[in-house]
Amino acid sequence: MDIIRQWYLYWAVRPWEKWIIKRADCIVVTSPQYRDGSKPLQKVKEKIRIVPNAIDEKLFELRIGDKERIQEIRALYNGKPIVFFMGRHTKYKGLPHLIEAERYMKSDCVIVIGGKGPLTKRLKALAKKRNSARIHFVGRLSEDDLRCYLYAASVFAFPSVTKNEAFGVALAEAMYCYTPAVTFTIEGSGVNWVNLNGITGIEVSQKGNLNQVYAEALDKLVRDTSLQKEYSRAE
């Protein structure tokens, strides 16, 4: 992965990087976008092979008892559409954009945030400051509950904003469970290769008020169940 945030470290590792790239017989990347957006790889494209990340499909296949659990999850939120996030609570995941987007959302839905991380306390404080009853933190989930939450959700929120998010395995997991996603445009990242704008979900440009434009995209998908179905069944 390219060094994005700690850019000052790059000068220390750059000689090693050049040496390794020169010596390599094959360089594996997870998407064409990452290949084309990585400056060190531009002169060695003939060495590059694209091998996407994969998921364990068996973990996300519906099992006996899942339908009842999915209904239980929906009932927890009074049957309102669920906008679901699952991932580590770190800076590049862009979770403040999701939490701040809530103030602009006009649809009657809930935002359910799964996972934990170094920013969890700060994110909970931000949500508390919003004083909104529709933002819920559920922490780490078991494999069974994660699967059921993905099927229960109407929309999968994936608000990452930097190339540190190189692919988006969680996107693939959500899409396997027929849950369309809303992502940001991330230049040089495979995120927009996994979630295809207007085909499997909605891609939001990082221009203007990011919180507001993200909210508008979430609203559009939450309100349009026909569009949800169209995106979820795309091949």
Whereabouts are the PLM-identified features?
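Nucleotide-activated donor-binding/catalytic signature segment of Leloir-type glycosyltransferases, i.e.
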Residues: 80, 121-144, 203
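Acidic donor-binding loop of glycosyltransferase active sites
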Residues: 25, 151-166, 179
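Conserved donor-binding/catalytic core segment of Leloir-type glycosyltransferases
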Residues: 72, 76-93, 99-103
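Short hydrophobic beta-strand element within catalytic cores of glycosyltransferases
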Residues: 176-187
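Short alpha-helical donor nucleotide-sugar binding micro-motif in glycosyltransferases
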Residues: 21, 140-141, 148-153
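Nucleotide-sugar donor phosphate/pyrophosphate-binding loop at the beta->alpha transition
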Residues: 2-19, 65
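A short, active-site helix/loop in glycosyltransferases that binds the activated sugar's phosphate group
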Residues: 18, 22-59
